[in-house]
């Protein structure tokens, strides 16, 4: 058995040193490393990569040597040259600065809004999203329904959990990468209004 390490969003770490990958510390050759350029360059590039431990490399070549990549050779060679010339690292540095500024702006706007006193920011040091724990007794489904009635679409952490638990309730997932910051204050006010009306009867349990 092997561990599949999907190092998604690892390039965007804003606090502290990069965390070593499991693959880099694996001495038993049981970790397969996966990553993609879709977030760091563009989703349309559709180029990902996989690092295999030596003991699996020959098996891969034997069993899957016939596999044909769907990405054109031209795009692969262009990306390879981009990396070889050091342009990728320069690009990544610019993107990290841009997203750090965007993240800081979103956190600041949340703190300045009426929602601020009922929201606790979590997991904001890496990736292009963070979590916000809301102070509310509303079930997540009811919170989402009431928000939808005000034109808001909320992504809750419990939506991604196959076994929802109380410890993961009331946690909002905020993806700020493509967020329109000019509309955020109004959205935060609408969400604050939803929490203001918490005492209204729930439509579901």
Regions found by a protein language model. Give the residues of each.
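Conserved PLP-binding active-site segment of the aspartate aminotransferase-like
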Residues: 52, 131-137, 154-194
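Catalytic PLP-binding core of fold-type I/II PLP enzymes
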Residues: 1-15
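Catalytic cores of nucleotide-enabled group-transfer and carboxylate-activating enzymes in metabolic
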Residues: 21, 61, 79, 110-111
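Active-site PLP attachment segment
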Residues: 24-59
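Active-site C-terminal subdomain of aminotransferase-like
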Residues: 56-75
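Structural signature of PLP-dependent enzymes
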Residues: 61-64, 85-107
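Conserved glycine-rich beta-strand-loop-beta hairpin in the small C-terminal domain of fold type I
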Residues: 80, 97-107, 119-133, 143-146
């Amino acid at each position: 058995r092997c561990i599949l390490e999907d190092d998604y969003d690892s390039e965007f770490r804003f606090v502290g040193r990069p965390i070593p990958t499991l693959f880099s510390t694996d001495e038993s050759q049981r970790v397969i490393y996966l990553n993609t350029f879709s977030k760091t360059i563009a989703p349309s590039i559709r180029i990902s990569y996989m690092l295999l431990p030596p003991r699996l490399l020959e098996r891969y070549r034997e069993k899957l040597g016939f596999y044909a990549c769907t990405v054109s050779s031209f795009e692969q060679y262009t990306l390879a040259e981009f990396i070889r010339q050091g342009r990728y690292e320069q690009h990544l540095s610019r993107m990290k600065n841009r997203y750090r500024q965007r993240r800081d702006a979103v956190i600041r706007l949340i703190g300045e809004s009426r929602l601020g006193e009922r929201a606790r920011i979590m997991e904001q040091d890496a990736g292009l999203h963070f979590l916000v724990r809301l102070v509310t007794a509303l079930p997540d489904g009811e919170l989402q329904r009431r928000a939808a009635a005000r034109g808001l679409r909320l992504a809750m952490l419990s939506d991604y959990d196959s076994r929802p638990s109380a410890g993961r309730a009331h946690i909002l997932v905020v993806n700020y990468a493509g967020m329109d910051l000019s509309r955020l204050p109004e959205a935060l006010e609408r969400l604050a209004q939803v929490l203001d009306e918490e005492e209204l009867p729930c439509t579901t349990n």
